[in-house]
Structure formats: structure tokens, C-alpha cells
């Protein structure tokens, strides 16, 4: 599966973009990317702001979610690094598979993180340790960078999948360090 998957993904992507020429692709996909880049953060912000009102009472134990999130983020970081190494070694098909996998894991993380805010007790998940200022600085910078990484990641993937490799390289120079 590991050997076959990059080729299957490559074939699917080529079929999707084959029927539309480049200008039509941009006319369709650029507005979609821009819209998603605005809608997703707004939806996440709304869910986070109103999570006290939207809290889901559940008898299930979701205390494993922070560990799950750490595993997702750690695996994503490994995949991003591996993808960087692959493209430096000119293994573009495997690079594409690894980067799409990293994007999928990041998407699963976002969905799971929002879900965790709806099911976990907020009073027990707030950080109240002696490094509150440091924690808040890291948290706020993380939130601001996450706003930038979504459109950058979407445009990076789009330019790479459509074969616009110069544009892809220019965007990835910003996307990679922010995403990491």
C-alpha cells in the first residue's frame, strides 16, 4: 500500500485537473481556497467562543484527546520533515503522498481539537501554572500563525497539485516554517 498509494493519488489528481485548463482552474479553485481560509477560522473561533453554551455532556471519557492531539501534531511534523527530505532527493510522487498525508492529519487534528473543546471541562483544561505569561504568549502566537498557515497550506497544495512548481516553491518557503 505504501508503494502504491503515491501513484494512485498522483493518478487521481491528474484526472481531476486534466479536464480544466489553468485559467479556469484558478477561476474555480482560488475563490474556494480564499473562502475556506476565511470560513474555517471564523467557524472555529465561533465554536471556541461559544463552547460554554455548546458544551456536549457525555458519559464517555475523552481525557485521551490531548495525547491524541500531540500524536497527530508530532506525526505531522515528522511527515513535513520527511516530505522536505523527499523533494530535496527528487522523489516527487512520494513527496506528494507524504504532504497530502500531513494535511489530512492536520485536518483531523483541527476537527478533534474543536470537538475536545466541546466535550472537555474547560475549568480543568485551563493552564494555571507558574508560567502563565509564557503559556499565553505561545498560545496567542500559535493562534495567529495558524490563521496564516491555512491559506498558505491550501495554496501550496493547489500549486503543487496543478504542476505550478515555481509558484509552489515560492509559497512553500513561507508555509513550511509556519506549519512546523
Predicted regions and their residues:
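Alpha-helical membrane insertion/targeting regions
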Residues: 17-180
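Aromatic (phenylalanine/tyrosine) cluster motif
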Residues: 2-7, 17-18
